Amino acid sequence: MDTLTRFLPEHLQQNQLPEALGGVLLSVVSACTEINAKVRLGALAGVLGMAGTGNIQGEDQKKLDVIANNIMIDTLKANPAVAGLASEEEDSFVSAGENGRYLVLFDPLDGSSNIDVNISVGTIFSILEKPEGALATESFLQTGRQQLAAGYVLYGPQTQLVFTFGHGVYMFTLNAENEFVLTKEKPKVPESTKEFAINMSNRRHWLPPVQQYIDELLAGETGTRGKNYNMRWVASMVAEIHRILMRGGVFMYPQDKRDPSKPGKLRLMYEANPMALILEQAGASASNARQDILGIRPESLHQRVAVIMGSSEEVDYLNRLHSK
């Protein structure tokens, strides 16, 4: 089986991609391998619990949020091809190599609310080309379609790397020698599914199309949809999307009525966009109920967005309910 270090040069060459772009991916992987070691040790390394600080989102930070963020920043800044970074845990962008060609956006530890109870978490990343001119916030405000690469690392029972350069999705598993080994090529998400993932406790806040949709799913084979559905909810986007990539399903974090200034909970630039690219490359769909995630023109670095992702039949159906 191919290791990442053997696979990557050939993949880059076949698809006429720059070697430096592959080098940025390897820097991300190096950082994630270090993060994985911290996650695995947990309480033994004294890294669980709260950090006593908050991020730009107004969220309390866990110790591992801060540790993972610092590892990502330090590792990526050491790569001269990286011009700048943007993180969920940083108020603004971070400058890196003066002559760098690439921008990296990331959520260093997605699902960190689960870390103290030993449920899967992960790192999500997106790679963009730096536009001409001085580095500024506007340099990062590109649509998801402009991503050069996207991926995530899932820290679960197995540690797995999933990424795409826009030429299919590839999945690698970390072995005992700390090498990522290719274990799945070009997975395809089934168009239809019987699984959905949503936080049902928010039902009273949802907009009517989402309430109708979930009611139809819960009605099962005697209802409009004519089949029984199972619900899943991990509260870790990486874990939810990985399950969909492996066996299908639909994941939703929809807009609700609580705060009109926040059209969703998840962040467009370093959560929704990379996951949308991965799923689209695997034959699935991703929208905010009004348009494709990858076509949204970002207005700010930490912009939030409603998310509906997964098996295309379900995403399309929920989009149609919103258009009525």
UniProtKB/Swiss-Prot annotation:
GO terms for molecular function: fructose 1,6-bisphosphate 1-phosphatase activity; magnesium ion binding. Mg(2+) 2 binds at D107, D110, E271. It is an enzyme of class 3 (hydrolase). Pfam families: FBPase, FBPase_C. Substrate binds at D110, G111, S112, S113, N199, K265. GO terms for cellular component: cytosol. Binds 2 magnesium ions per subunit. GO terms for biological process: fructose 1,6-bisphosphate metabolic process; fructose 6-phosphate metabolic process; fructose metabolic process; gluconeogenesis; sucrose biosynthetic process. Pathway: Carbohydrate biosynthesis; gluconeogenesis. Mg(2+) 1 binds at E88, D107, L109. It catalyses: beta-D-fructose 1,6-bisphosphate + H2O = beta-D-fructose 6-phosphate + phosphate. InterPro entries: FBPase_C_dom, FBPase_class-1, FBPase_N, FBPtase. It comes from the Bacteria. Its cofactor is Mg(2+). Keywords: Carbohydrate metabolism, Cytoplasm, Hydrolase, Magnesium, Metal-binding. Its EC number is 3.1.3.11. Belongs to the FBPase class 1 family. Homotetramer. This is Fructose-1,6-bisphosphatase class 1. It comes from Neisseria meningitidis serogroup A / serotype 4A (strain DSM 15465 / Z2491).
